[in-house]
Amino acid sequence: MKTYQVFLGTNKPAGGTVSTQEWLTFLKQIDAVFTGYTVETASGSWQGIKEKTYILTVITDEIKQLIRIAEDYKMIFNQDSVLIQELPVKPLFV
């Protein structure tokens, strides 16, 4: 299994941001695919513009499902891009 982080910005190109309710609704899509994950709230910047960002961390072998979630987020919230990074760590569940 590998550890991935997905960076989900909340600024919308037409103005406004992803609301708390919109985010909670989107989380249901993640719940339907992954039984465990962590979400952190961060301050990010994309092309010089500051924005609230959610960082989704998942330990999985299902990278295709993670990419699908990122693509869905990008489409639903009209994002320019969504960053997925693979972390160089080996998870150990005790």
Which residues are covered by each model-predicted region?
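Positively charged, small/polar-rich N-terminal and surface patches that mediate targeting and assembly
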Residues: M1-V94
